[in-house]
Amino acid sequence: TYKLEEKNEKNGYRAVFEMTVKDGKITESKYDNINADGKSKTEDTKYEESMKAKSGVGPKEYIKQLNDSFVKAQSASGVEVVTGATHSSESFQNYAQQLIQAAQAGNTDTIEIDNGATLKDGTYSLKEKNDSNGYHTTFSMTVKDGKVTESNYDNVNADGKSKKDDTEYESKMKDVAGVGPKEYIETLNKEFVKAMGEEDGSPAGVEVVTGATHSTHSFINYAQQLVNAAEKGDTTEIVVDNIVTK
């Protein structure tokens, strides 16, 4: 059983998350938001009503949906984003990914997220271990004076060449989606630095790039993980053993 918890409450709640692995499979996902008394947000009828009125869904529904989706998908990236609860879904995916990484390493220490802490200066980096369609993600983020000053997200092949320079891929994707890696990779890096410069800035503030929705969600997921590392000041490179299904 692998556990993760946020240390700090936001709007009266913090996330707690427990994942059980049996015979190499995720058999149970218990993600929740609890208050200081340990009461679940799913039981907060007032919150449920006001959120439902605004976005058509409340914690009672989306928390269960996310847990079910995770067990079904057996991966963080496969979790369906719940309409009306995009931010919660992205946060869930980030934490699910961190639990999977802990499980791959067999590390059952509770992961503590110092959410909202001032970012510590340094360079934080993450990379995927496996190529998918010939490319894997590399991502580094620089923090100076508590602010994100630089974002270097890229997709590179085995020779370290960027997807941005793959003219064939660029023209193919542009035809289909109206945008290619040359554009969206740069846009995501720029948007991230901008989003983090806002008051209470977070990766969730990154706008989805039309035509590159999947890449945007993956970017936000990894950006959140780098921000969590910076909140703690942990500059160890994060290696994501992204499971590439054949």
For the regions a protein language model found, what residue spans apply to each?
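A short tyrosine-centered beta-strand micro-motif
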Residues: 1-2, 124
